[in-house]
Amino acid sequence: MAQPDSSSLAEVLDRVLDKGVVVDVWARISLVGIEILTVEARVVAASVDTFLHYAEEIAKIEQAELTAGAEAPEPAPEA
């Protein structure tokens, strides 16, 4: 059995930390229509630099949405 190439493993790890990986899980277990267990999880693997970059971009998007919502005129009341 051949050993995995350690340089390729290092390249994969470098790419995962550079780009980041998100695993989003949602599962519900029910028995006879009765919910027994619900699992919600989000796992993020990335370098701190990558995380901070994307967190900054997400904050900009959220701020733009809040600003757009505040500037939207209120609907006229119905008569």
Curated annotation (Swiss-Prot):
**Entry GO terms, CC:** gas vesicle shell; vesicle membrane
Q: Where is this region: Beta-strand 2?
A: 35-43
Region Beta-strand 1, as annotated, extends over: 23-31
InterPro entries tied to this protein: Gas-vesicle_GvpA-like, Gas_vesicle_GvpA, GvpA, GvpA-like_CS
- Recorded GO terms, molecular function? structural molecule activity
Q: Where is this region: Alpha helix 1?
A: 9-19
Q: What is its main location?
A: other
Keywords, A to Z? Gas vesicle, Plasmid
Q: Name what induces it.
A: Transcription is activated by c-GvpE. Poorly expressed at mid-log phase. In 'wild-type' cells (probably NRC-1/NRL) gas vesicles are seen at all stages of growth; in standing cultures, cells float. In this study gvpA2 (c-vac) was not detectably transcribed, presumably most to all gas vesicles are derived from the p-vac locus. If the p-vac locus is deleted gvpA2 is transcribed in late log phase and rises in stationary phase; gas vesicles appear during early stationary phase, but fewer vesicles are detected.
Stretch list, region Beta turn: 32-34
Q: Extract the ranges annotated as region (Alpha helix 2).
A: 48-67
**Which purpose does this protein serve, as stated in its record?**
Gas vesicles are hollow, gas filled proteinaceous nanostructures found in several microbial planktonic microorganisms. They allow positioning of halobacteria at the optimal depth for growth in the poorly aerated shallow brine pools of their habitat. GvpA forms the gas vesicle shell. This protein can replace the p-gvpA gene in the p-vac locus and increases the critical collapse pressure (CCP) of hybrid gas vesicles from 0.66 MPa to 0.90 MPa. In stationary phase gas vesicles about 30 times more GvpA1 is found than GvpA2.
Q: Which family does it belong to?
A: Belongs to the gas vesicle GvpA family.
The record's note on quaternary structure and interaction partners says: The gas vesicle shell is 2 nm thick and consists of a single layer of this protein. It forms helical ribs nearly perpendicular to the long axis of the vesicle.
- Give the misc comment: Encoded in a 14-gene locus called c-vac which produces cylindrical gas vesicles only in the stationary growth phase. This 'chromosomal' gene (c-vac, gvpA2) is only expressed during the stationary phase of growth, while the plasmid encoded gene (p-vac, gvpA1) is transcribed constitutively throughout the growth cycle.
Tell me what this protein is called. Gas vesicle protein A2
Name the source organism. Answer: Halobacterium salinarum (strain ATCC 700922 / JCM 11081 / NRC-1) (Halobacterium halobium)
- Where is the organism placed in the taxonomic lineage, from the top? Archaea, Methanobacteriati, Methanobacteriota, Stenosarchaea group, Halobacteria
